[in-house]
Amino acid sequence: MTNWVRLTGWIGLFAALLVGLGEFCLQYTPNGGVEDVENYLYFNDISAERLSLGHFISVLAAPLYLIGYWHLSKNLEPGGKFLSSAFFCIGAYAFAVGTAWIGQRFFIATTVHEIAAGADLKSQLTLFAEHNEPFVNVLRLAMVLVSLIWIIQISRGRTNYPRWMAIFSPALLLATMFALYFFGTAVGLYVFPVAMNATHFIVFALSLWATRGQAQVSHS
């Protein structure tokens, strides 16, 4: 693995951290309720200033996920180029769609604020939701697909990763984040609003750790 591939892993880790910070600003509330995709009442607990900060941080950082997925795919590549290329294409497409999703959250949130202030915008909120929520479902479906590739490739033992890394697939980690929230744990309240980013922070961190002795300078 070249130093360049390793650098892209750090970029992926940085993306997960920044988008996670932005999404935390956009969606975290100590009262929970982030699962409400009809009325989005939890947005009333979040100030317009915090929403604006989260919007810009997350949207500007989200495209860096594509670089991070290139890092993961290059570490899977020794196990088979076709599947590693499919892993990258699916992951990159998913996070391009995910950027569109997170870029619309600010506008949904401010519409909720206007409704709370007395504006008759319920139909507009419904329209926003109908054109926003499908994007995150595409992202979640993509996580299932890349996780299948992840498990298959790593389990064969020919990638840059040790076989135990197969356990830490994005889908399994994401399911763990959801379980922590819906089982009412204290940590779940914090990780659920940023579940996708917390998942990938773990994936990129483990990738960098598991391949830490493999970096070399490329002379090609």
Predicted segment positions?
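Hydrophobic, aromatic-enriched alpha-helical segments typical of multi-pass transmembrane helices
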Residues: 1-220
